UniProtKB/Swiss-Prot annotation:
Molecular function GO labels: S-adenosylmethionine:tRNA ribosyltransferase-isomerase activity
Family: Belongs to the QueA family.
Pathway where this protein functions: tRNA modification; tRNA-queuosine biosynthesis
Main location: cytoplasm
Function according to Swiss-Prot or TrEMBL: Transfers and isomerizes the ribose moiety from AdoMet to the 7-aminomethyl group of 7-deazaguanine (preQ1-tRNA) to give epoxyqueuosine (oQ-tRNA).
The gene coding this protein: queA
Keywords annotated in UniProt: Cytoplasm, Queuosine biosynthesis, S-adenosyl-L-methionine, Transferase
Record-annotated membrane-spanning stretches: none
Coiled coil: none
Reactions this protein catalyses: 7-aminomethyl-7-carbaguanosine(34) in tRNA + S-adenosyl-L-methionine = epoxyqueuosine(34) in tRNA + adenine + L-methionine + 2 H(+)
Annotated compartments: Cytoplasm
Annotated protein name in UniProt: S-adenosylmethionine:tRNA ribosyltransferase-isomerase
GO CC terms, sorted: cytoplasm
Subunit structure: Monomer.
Length: 351
């Protein structure tokens, strides 16, 4: 499909720079088949059924944004993907001033060697010393806010909490699974009281999630890879949910992408550990999920393509036009949407 089919105009004032407080006070646009309903995140239990299961991503965002010097040249780096204990793939700003074999001093006793430059222009950075890289980042790094926020304000101490979900426990993400930012202990208690189950998986969200689609056609876009894991007991419980008539609702596109990566053609979810570069566009045959809770996404982005695949492009265009007109808050710190497609069997294709 043409990428420009997924374009729309978003007024800049609709971009949220801070989250709702409390978190579950955010608004939620429900798209139930073709119906569009204004609601709030706290209404979520009313839109689900006893026996349904919400699936969260438990990745933890690390302070992966670094600023340093190579001699007198200022070098910025956003860590993207862990390679091993000491090496990370990173997107580098002012990359023309950095060559393979040179060292960047990030301050606070943190330095890294530019070990290799990859075909996509990113670098492999090898960190010096024996301390775990995650500890080095706590000293020298800042939270890697999305560019549409960072372009308007710098990261601050509040973001260390605001840009972390209550489920975060597995270090490795450089972007938050933002749909889960809306959840609070009180909301989880209400969901449990309504008979809604919860499960977790891990997908370490990379900085590639913010990369623009430069191709003119979706067939020509190369999707970034991210590492994920679904434990065997988690997969078994999710399969039991669907076998008993419950629905699997992914909380966030990261959870959805990993579940779909781990699913067989018959919809059975299998244990998974490895990279996924799944790219979901209209015409995709969904296998593992029955709904999605997600924030509002950028025009022309792979994530708007994903929700259009789930609900239909015309439906999502109408939903986003409604959200803009009703002044919903967009993107990572913004409001939520709950997408419930028409059910047509366990595996289905929507376009």
């Amino acid at each position: 499909m043409r990428v420009d089919a997924f374009d729309f105009d978003l007024p800049s004032e609709r971009i949220a720079l801070r989250p709702a407080r409390p978190r579950d006070a955010a608004r939620m646009l429900v798209v139930d088949a073709g119906n569009i309903v204004d609601a709030g995140v706290r209404d979520l239990p009313q839109w689900l059924r006893p026996g349904d299961c919400l699936v969260f991503n438990d990745t933890r965002v690390i302070p992966a944004q670094l600023e340093g010097l190579r001699g007198e040249a200022k070098i910025g780096a956003t860590l993207h993907k862990r390679i091993d204990l000491r090496r990370w793939q990173a997107f580098v700003r002012n990359a023309k001033r950095l060559r393979v074999g040179e060292t960047v001093d990030f301050g606070s006793g943190v330095a890294a060697l530019a070990e290799e430059r990859l075909a996509d222009g990113s670098f492999v950075l090898a960190f010096a010393g024996d301390e775990p890289v995650e500890l080095l980042l706590e000293r020298a790094g800042t939270m890697p806010l999305p560019p549409y926020i960072a372009g308007k304000r710098g990261a601050d101490e509040a973001d260390r909490d605001d840009y972390q979900t209550m489920f975060a426990r597995e270090d490795g993400a450089v972007a938050a699974p933002t749909a889960a930012l809306h959840f609070t202990p009180e909301l989880l208690a209400a969901l449990a009281a309504a008979g809604i189950a919860t499960e977790t998986l891990t997908l370490h969200v990379g900085a590639g999630t913010f990369l623009p689609v430069k191709a003119d056609d979706t067939d020509d876009h190369v999707m970034h890879a991210e590492w994920g894991r679904i434990e065997a007991d988690t997969a078994a419980r999710l399969n039991a949910v669907r076998a008993s008539g419950g629905r699997v609702i992914a909380v966030g596109t990261t959870s959805l992408r990993l579940l779909e990566s781990a699913a067989r053609d018959d919809g059975t979810i299998t244990p998974f550990a490895g990279d996924t570069s799944i790219f979901i566009t209209p015409g995709y045959r969904f296998k593992a999920i029955d709904g999605l809770m997600t924030n509002f996404h950028l025009p022309r982005s792979t994530l708007f393509m994903l929700v259009s695949a789930l609900m239909g492009l015309e439906t999502m265009q109408a939903a986003y036009a409604h959200a803009i007109a009703r002044e919903y808050r967009f993107y990572s710190y913004g409001d939520a949407s709950l997408l419930l497609p028409r059910q047509s069997g366990r595996s289905r294709t929507l376009s």
